[in-house]
Amino acid sequence: LHTVKENYIFEHDELNKIDYKNKKVIMITAHRRENWGEGIENICTALNKIVEENEDVELVYLVHLNPIVKDVVFEKLGGNPRIHLLPPQDTQETHNLMNKSFMVMTDSGGLQEEAPHLGKPVLVLRDVTERPEAVEYGTVKLVGTDVEKIVCEANNLINNEEAYEAMSKAVNPYGDGKASERIADAILRYFDLSDKEVDEFDR
């Protein structure tokens, strides 16, 4: 991702104060209509448990502005110094936060594609996904909104290095970021302007 920078300084200063090197920071987004009500409540309950059970974990929840989501999240998670509740961030802030994070928990479709590019395991807070290839290749895992399942899968990634490595180093089904180079090579070869073989993406 071209938006990611190694020494990125966030515009939102609270993000600059987080100890990414010594803490396992989990980035969270959850706002889909299907999760309104009991789903969001369960997610929040699970997040509280994850923080309680893991002293080296901090959460950054980018909270949707819809009161149906925001009110529940702030009521259940507000006031915990290791849970940072922030408004949605722009693309560059979000990508760099994701890059500095340990893992991602989300019900967003886009993040299921973006996080694997950065080697970040994704727990999907839904029972189904439009990205079944990500599940197949092991870059994401469906956990739904069941409290115990969310906590169990999160704790496994937090405390089991082998499980974390398996997801973070899984083959990314969405490519390697070199599609435009391959297209250019293919066009040049088609018009006999180059004899370079096109490097195909191999999953």
Task: Report each predicted region and the residues it spans.
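Nucleotide-activated sugar donor-binding and catalytic core shared by glycosyltransferases
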Residues: 1-61, 66-203
